[in-house]
């Protein structure tokens, strides 16, 4: 895409209350714009990244045997009263009335809604397991929304739900999603730690949070120093990962963690996903029942699995940035290549830039502006495309272009044909 045809409102500076890199660069690079406290509009480049993460999440959930649905964001308050959560959830849940005076809520989560859906058709143990997921915008009226899209009031989330006959079945579903999450994170270039956690307002008795470790994270994770190495190993099983101690601050037991004090590390992290074994926490009060093999009535056992898609954008920027901008991993970059012509009045350079752009149009952002070379190069560093093609004096003298790796700053000179072949590979 040509920069002149794309809406990329970059900013030179941000306000002094913007303190974390993901907040700063999501604003400066024109990924989002704030409409109100904790509420953001996703602009073209930011939305491209968001959609790419959605696609990766969908592919891995689909391959894990989950089927996509879409539930309403507004839910009847009566469902929440049925589950006994309406009064206990707190002021972060937005409550309202429709024109008929019926009480409604803007769902911060969807356990009640999915239980209502499944109970309407569940009859027999033969109907189970049922594995469903959705990607849906949610709203939680945070008391102090902060750090931009890392902790906004509105956020995009993938939430999945499993319904099984027995505990062994739920654990198979739990393990299935646990593995899928590690595949998702690896495709995004992230290395998370899976930490035992408190279930909080969701409920249930078994829970793990997935944290990306960064100094600016708001969560504290206690973990064996081997945990991060295992998470990096593509061939490590989920059982091996889960067997190494890691726990959130609420779940950490310093007396019984079983880790040598010399091996126990305390890290800051961003929570990007959470999985829960719910048991019959919702199926019992909401009568999600089936008839078992003996004809007896039983409650389905549930699991719940969430991953913060919009928060993942923030986590990725926190991991992949430097002092001048974002350094997108190639798997999720809005464009693979940024094309910069430094000599806009040179006809040969203009023709070469157009030739490269024509060959790489779908995967490239071509800065066709007449801005100064310094402005163009700084803007491309800020936007963070994995590769930069720079056309300037080297082309005039030697008919070669400069190829820059944004991740490490390394540059090399190559012919136009060699460049195109490499970027198309």
Curated annotation (Swiss-Prot):
Where is it found, in Gene Ontology cellular component terms? cytosol
Q: What is this protein called?
A: Proline--tRNA ligase
Alphabetic keyword roster: Aminoacyl-tRNA synthetase, ATP-binding, Cytoplasm, Ligase, Nucleotide-binding, Protein biosynthesis
| Enzyme Commission numbers on file | 6.1.1.15
- Disulfide bond annotation, renumbered to this chain: none
Q: Give TM regions.
A: none
Catalytic activity from the UniProt record: tRNA(Pro) + L-proline + ATP = L-prolyl-tRNA(Pro) + AMP + diphosphate
Q: Which Gene Ontology molecular-function terms are recorded?
A: ATP binding; proline-tRNA ligase activity
Can you name the source organism?
Answer: Anaplasma marginale (strain St. Maries)
Question: Where mainly found?
Answer: cytoplasm
Tree of life domain: Bacteria
- What's the subunit arrangement here? Homodimer.
Q: Kindly list the biological process annotations in GO that this record carries.
A: prolyl-tRNA aminoacylation
What does the UniProt function comment say about this protein? Catalyzes the attachment of proline to tRNA(Pro) in a two-step reaction: proline is first activated by ATP to form Pro-AMP and then transferred to the acceptor end of tRNA(Pro).
Q: Which InterPro entries does this entry report, sorted A to Z?
A: aa-tRNA-synt_IIb (IPR002314), aa-tRNA-synth_II (IPR006195), aa-tRNA-synth_II/BPL/LPL (IPR045864), Anticodon-bd (IPR004154), Anticodon-bd_dom_sf (IPR036621), Pro-tRNA-ligase_IIa (IPR002316), Pro-tRNA-synth_IIa_bac-type (IPR004500), Pro-tRNA_synthetase (IPR050062)
Enzyme superclass (EC): ligase
Give the subcellular location: Cytoplasm
Family label: Belongs to the class-II aminoacyl-tRNA synthetase family. ProS type 2 subfamily.
């Amino acid at each position: 895409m040509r920069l002149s045809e794309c809406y990329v409102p970059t900013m030179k500076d941000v306000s002094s209350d913007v303190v974390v890199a993901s907040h700063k660069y999501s604003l400066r690079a024109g990924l989002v714009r704030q409409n109100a406290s904790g509420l953001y509009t996703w602009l073209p480049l930011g939305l491209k990244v968001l959609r790419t993460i959605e696609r990766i999440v969908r592919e891995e959930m689909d391959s894990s045997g989950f089927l996509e649905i879409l539930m309403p964001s507004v839910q009847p308050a009566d469902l929440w009263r049925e589950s006994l959560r309406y009064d206990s959830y707190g002021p972060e849940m937005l409550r309202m009335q429709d024109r008929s005076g019926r009480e409604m809520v803007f769902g911060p989560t969807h356990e009640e809604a999915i239980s209502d859906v499944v109970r309407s058709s569940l009859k027999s143990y033969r109907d189970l397991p049922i594995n469903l997921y959705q990607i849906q915008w949610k709203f939680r009226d945070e008391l102090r929304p902060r750090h931009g899209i890392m902790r906004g009031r509105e956020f995009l989330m993938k939430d999945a739900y499993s319904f099984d006959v027995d505990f062994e079945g739920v654990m198979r579903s739990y393990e299935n999603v646990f593995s899928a999450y590690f595949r998702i994170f690896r495709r995004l270039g992230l290395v998370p730690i899976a930490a035992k956690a408190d279930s909080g307002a969701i409920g249930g008795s078994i829970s793990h949070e997935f944290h990306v470790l960064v100094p600016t994270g708001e969560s504290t994770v206690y973990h064996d120093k081997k945990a991060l190495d295992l998470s990096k190993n593509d061939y490590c099983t989920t059982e091996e990962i889960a067997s190494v101690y890691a726990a959130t601050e609420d779940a950490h037991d310093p007396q019984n963690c079983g880790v040598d004090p010399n091996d126990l590390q305390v890290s800051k992290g961003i929570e990007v996903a959470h999985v829960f074994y719910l048991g019959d926490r919702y199926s019992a009060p909401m009568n999600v029942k089936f008839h078992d093999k003996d004809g007896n009535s039983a409650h389905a056992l549930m699991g719940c699995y969430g991953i913060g898609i919009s928060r993942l954008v923030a986590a990725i920027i926190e991991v992949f940035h430097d002092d001048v901008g974002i350094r997108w991993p190639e798997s999720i970059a809005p464009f693979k290549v940024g094309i910069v012509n430094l000599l806009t009045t040179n006809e040969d350079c203009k023709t070469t830039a157009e030739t490269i752009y024509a060959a790489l149009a779908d995967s490239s952002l071509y800065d066709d502006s007449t801005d100064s070379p310094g402005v163009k190069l700084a803007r491309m560093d800020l936007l963070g495309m994995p590769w930069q093609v720079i056309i300037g004096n080297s082309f005039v003298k030697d008919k070669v272009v400069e190829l820059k790796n944004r991740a490490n700053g390394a540059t090399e000179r190559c012919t136009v044909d060699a460049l195109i072949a490499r970027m198309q590979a």
